[in-house]
A protein has these predicted regions:
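P-loop NTP-binding module
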Residues: 1-259
């Protein structure tokens, strides 16, 4: 029996911990209007500007996933690339920015790509304290997130204690941290490792309320996309759709269903 199959079985048995926040007290939303804390910046921040066409297309994706007035619209969503190099972190960063500009409640973007973290670089902040540290610690999640400006956008970076921490993405501490984030933020966007790198993306996809797959135009293979869809469906993850980067538009359901 393969290791991946055994892990999928484990994920199925542990679904209750994904779906509930048992034992967690309700938390008040963070003070969105408060000024951000001062964090030491590392290097020069990467540019966050988007071309008008890029912004319009990512806006369509955000509206489709979060803001279409669905009775059960997802609040916790994983974004994961089919393979490495699809630009998933770029898409996640900008989708979080746009979502925060469209809603009043707090939005948190989480760097769960412990193998190759990048969100902190896009936002121009350090990576000294974040998810990996939270998985090893007992402090409330509010001690690990940081505001990203006067807007209602917050970051849970990868953190400094990421060595060999990727295995904890399918651990009880990770499930409890996600349940805590759900209670603390209105929306949570999670930048996950690429599907081709192992079980992490599948585990996080099952933990969340939905998954958006990111493909790269003229690069992502159809076979890899089909396998990613099958793996997520086997794990019981809800696939919300896909985004084709470097053309950057949501793939219509009629096309996505043929993957």
């Amino acid at each position: 029996m393969s290791r991946n199959f055994e892990l999928l079985q484990r994920l199925s048995q542990d679904q209750e911990m994904f779906d509930t926040g048992a034992g967690l007290s309700a938390l008040s939303p963070p003070p969105v209007a408060s000024p951000p804390r001062h964090w030491e910046r590392e290097g020069k921040p990467l540019k966050l500007e988007m071309e008008e066409k890029q912004r319009d297309e990512i806006m369509k994706c955000v509206q489709h996933v979060f803001l279409m007035g669905k009775t059960e619209a997802p609040r916790t969503v994983v974004l994961t690339g089919i393979e490495s190099g699809t630009g998933c972190t770029w898409i996640c960063c900008r989708a979080a920015q746009i979502l925060a500009s469209q809603v009043k409640g707090p939005v948190c973007v989480v760097d769960a790509n412990l193998r190759s973290p990048g969100l902190h670089q896009y936002f121009g902040v350090d990576n000294h304290y974040g998810l990996a540290d939270a998985l090893h610690g007992t402090e409330p999640i509010r001690d690990f997130v940081r505001p990203l400006g006067p807007e209602n956008l917050w970051l849970l970076s990868c953190g400094s204690d990421a060595t060999n921490s990727h295995s904890r993405l399918i651990s009880d501490p990770m499930r409890l941290r996600l349940a805590e984030l759900r209670q603390y933020f209105e929306y949570v966007l999670i930048d996950a490792p690429a599907m081709s790198l192992g079980i992490d993306g599948i585990a996080l996809g099952r933990a969340a309320e939905g998954v958006v797959l990111v493909l790269k135009a003229n690069a992502s293979r159809r076979e890899a996309a089909r396998k990613a869809v099958q793996d997520l469906q086997t794990a019981g993850a809800r696939i919300l759709g896909a985004v084709l980067n470097q053309r950057t538009f949501p793939i219509p359901q009629a096309i996505y269903s043929k993957l």
